[in-house]
Curated annotation (Swiss-Prot):
InterPro entries: Cystine-knot_cytokine (IPR029034), TGF-b_C (IPR001839), TGF-b_propeptide (IPR001111), TGF-beta-rel (IPR015615), TGFb_CS (IPR017948). This is Growth/differentiation factor 8. The keyword Iron does not apply. Disulfide bonds join C273-C283, C282-C341, C310-C373, C314-C375.
Amino acid sequence: MHLSQIVLYLSLLIALGPVVLSDQEAHQQPSVSTPVDTDQCATCEVRQQIKTMRLNAIKSQILSKLRMKEAPNISREIVKQLLPKAPPLQQLLDQYDVLGDDNREEVLEDDDEHATTETIVMVATEPDPAVQVDGQPKCCFFSITQKFQASRVVRAQLWVHLRPSEEVTTVFLQISRLIPVTDGNRHIRSRSLKIDVNPGPASWQSIDVKQVLTVWLRQPETNWGIEINAFDSRGNDLAVTSAEPGEEGLQPFMEVKISEGPRRARRDSGLDCDENSPESRCCRYPLTVDFEDFGWDWIIAPKRYKANYCSGECEYMHLQKYPHTHLVNKANPRGTAGPCCTPTKMSPINMLYFNRKEQIIYGKIPSMVVDRCGCS
């Protein structure tokens, strides 16, 4: 190659070099804003993943806290058949209507793993044939679960629905404990209540059966059930003891109030955000759990509640529980994986539900609502 050609080649290389580099930079320039959009999309995806994980965790937690391996197979139609049309149950349902998502206390139980039961409603079933004569009586047996054994019974009320009376009359509501038939005897008279009834619509009446329940708890083998009668002055039995046509949901039931020990309170603080918040730090976000979406018709109330979830970044200095933690992490940054955004305060929810024995339970399930989030 001649010297003149070499000089020309070098001159072109020097002249065109910057132009090529400028073209590359021009092509790369629009991609500068891409990481920002990618970060925003990534944040949305992370939150969505956290919400999905939280919902799945809530399903597992509820079953675990209620000591269930799987959800009871109770459909909406069965719920309508089993749900008593009774005053105390309606009061519990009205409580949810009035209180909504605020029907929980700012406390946590000592047992944070399992549900603390407050009220159990047991619908009467047919007693064992050993205490029946010619298929009678058809009522009433109450299955006493182990839940009672570890609890303190505060109150036990038997609710009986009385058919309407055409005249003013005195009704004697009688409760008799059933025993296996021997020598024609199958009863042990337990309680009797005198009731003055006015003519008019049907009514619910209650009678204290704590003493009867106490006997069953101490001697489970004596629980064969009870017979209920409510005779008026003419000898008519006004008590509804079985679900005859037109009397569905009016069968007797027992309402038991129990207590399971003290509770303890906890306090904390944190940040609250919504889904449109630009906050990148650890924050509490809203999340509504809908049991109907789960297909869980066995939960009577609430049908939905606000569970919330935690999401965000945690710097060593941000919302740490102890001030010295930041100094330790700064001195040894490789000695820890760093704080995570997690719930620092949780509270229970009240729930009315059917268990596997088709008993209606009103209880408090601990640690189901995220009240505060923090880095720990």
